[in-house]
Amino acid sequence: MLEYYNDADKESVYENYVKIVSKPKNINDVSITQMITEVLKQFNSKRFLYNLCCSKELTFLKNILNNEIDEDDFLDYMFEIKTLSKKFIFDQDNFCIFSEQIDNVKYAIKKFNKYGAKSDEYIYPISILRIVGFLPLEMFKSANYENTKYERKLTFEEYLSNPLLKFYTTIYEENDEKYICYANYYELIPEIEEERKNYINFKSLTSNKYLIEEMFYYGFPIYNKKVKKMYEFINQNIPYIIDYVDEARVLNDYSTVERFLKDDKARKIINEGLEYSPSCALYGLSPVDYLDLKDSE
């Protein structure tokens, strides 16, 4: 694993390192070798990998161990490969589990076969944050922790320390109030807040099962035909712009991605898909749903 990461960009390694270890060091005080050492030390806790992965990832790892899939199946497992690589579990260049993680994976699969994926229970709150961007921590606590089975078994701090939840979220403070956000959107929060000044908060966010699952796995509600067409078009033709398309969705700002598009067909497919994708700037509504609510006022 050290050889794999020694040539990697330090900032990219650090971005994932802070999501894994319980007490990360400042980027200027830690080398890549030290980061990998600390990551592996974190994985020494036997249940850590099991709690860090959702059912899709554990099923993928199980299939890898059983030699049931190989690199020819790459496009069918983009979510699993991307996330497990970021979690220091899967070597996507050689399409294999890192040797240092084999025993941890075997233990996790044994738990998965017996109990299922316990961390799947955290998919809902993670998806809501991906849809709306951020929430006051007290609101998040009220919606996901208070008066639930978690409150009877765990302190709120213990609930927040779940490895899967911690991997996808960041807690920060603004104007003496704590907030929790989808981690990848932390740098976009000032822009989200600025964009929201142009829109009404209808407080009518709906979240069906398909929306929740697909926002977690794909970042887009691909059960919608136009969104699915957009998602498949991007992955098959211009996969390198997927993060820019996601940013366009978050900010409801098509210019974020349009500058990369010279083809009218691509522009049309992507814009139509974004029209049906929930935007953080629109308080979690899609542009189409937002306009429908505005027109019905």
Which residues does each PLM region occupy?
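Accessory beta->alpha helical hairpin/"wing" motif in late/C-terminal subdomains of nucleic-acid enzymes
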Residues: 26-42, 86-116, 170-193
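Short, amphipathic alpha-helical interaction segments positioned at domain boundaries
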Residues: 47-49, 100-131, 184-208
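Short capping segments at the starts of secondary-structure elements
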Residues: 55-59, 65-72, 128-139, 222, ...
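DNA-recognition alpha helix
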Residues: 14-18, 139-147
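Basic helix-extension-helix modules of the SAP/HeH family
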Residues: 1-99
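Long, charge-rich C-terminal accessory regions
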Residues: 154-255
